[in-house]
């Protein structure tokens, strides 16, 4: 194995980039970059029935969007390709033949039905289901008989008995497995396609992968992969198994969990910022020293330390994600945020599909009002409802404000001045409110709160003169006149 750090993220194109897989990719990326190593993407595409047509493209597209630039993959061959498992059969076949020739593997002709009967009987006896080795020592005559019946064999690895398989996990510490608890397992399916645990060990060896960092749901795969390494006399890579991601109920994050968006594409579509999502995911199961939580990609690379990967489950905190993204939104220029929000404004029919310059100018002012509050670009639609919907019925607190003794006088003065105001812009609106203050003697909360409630129906909100400008003269006058 090379001294150079080489890690891999190996997705299957059977689905889109899940938040858990994105974390696996991200930690591999940070580990590689921290040690000036290589971040490799390998596509495990042997499950042809479940592969999505755009699954591979989607994986690459969303990894790139997150800022995870790879050093090697299907588009960057560095001498370790092919990078799709489906194109590596010529590498696997001689090794399969070698295991058969050395009696480290054998053909098994049992049908799915026979295996299921065995499995059910073991469960009924309270045993862990495992293959019982019925075809581990077939005679040549028996093999010929099964083939004459048209049975297609799978190929099983002959698991050495009474052995302990141990590895020093970079997250969990020492982990051991007793080989007697592992039945002879399939390395090649009946259709001739190598299974995951066989192919992945071969690929990691030939691609000189130094470290395998993945979710702890892969721990049980590790002894099988070590068996393959030992069968060929190869040195295994180092292993690290990250803790699970859990939801608010502290249950494993599931793709069926309706409370949490599961896929990077969904956050992208809502208008989250890639650097914010990078930051949030980097803190799922890893923590820096100190209290700071906002870091750039370059800072994460510099401070990343695999020893700080947590053994405890990582809590997916939606409020924390909203806060992190808001920190980044506040730092962005308004034009960037507006361009992210524009598709959402168009989809909600708040800006025409083919907007005029006037529409775009109005949209930019709207974003400027709410940018510091926004958790994601798409949130502009619910945040700014007062600009598009009829005024809601006032709450008790708002009603008390609008029923104030001086309100009719205030509204009469403000209405007449705003009605004559040209241009209807922030600077002029500010002047007008000051004039009303001088003429009526009403000031402070007695001045601003009734105006805000009258034009927005709310006690709090963005800067009042800016809000009045964005609402527009017609809407503001219509709302004021009922309180004159």
Curated annotation (Swiss-Prot):
HAMAP family: Glu_tRNA_synth_type1. A motif ('KMSKS' region) lies at residues 252-256. Keywords: Aminoacyl-tRNA synthetase, ATP-binding, Cytoplasm, Ligase, Nucleotide-binding, Protein biosynthesis. PANTHER family: GLUTAMATE--TRNA LIGASE, GLUTAMATE--TRNA LIGASE, MITOCHONDRIAL-RELATED. It comes from the Bacteria. CDD domains: GluRS_core. It is an enzyme of class 6 (ligase). It is found in: Cytoplasm. Belongs to the class-I aminoacyl-tRNA synthetase family. Glutamate--tRNA ligase type 1 subfamily. One of its GO terms (biological process) is glutamyl-tRNA aminoacylation. ATP binds at residue 255. GO terms for cellular component: cytosol. This is Glutamate--tRNA ligase. Catalyzes the attachment of glutamate to tRNA(Glu) in a two-step reaction: glutamate is first activated by ATP to form Glu-AMP and then transferred to the acceptor end of tRNA(Glu). Monomer. Its EC number is 6.1.1.17. Disulfide bonds: none annotated. GO terms for molecular function: ATP binding; glutamate-tRNA ligase activity; tRNA binding; zinc ion binding.
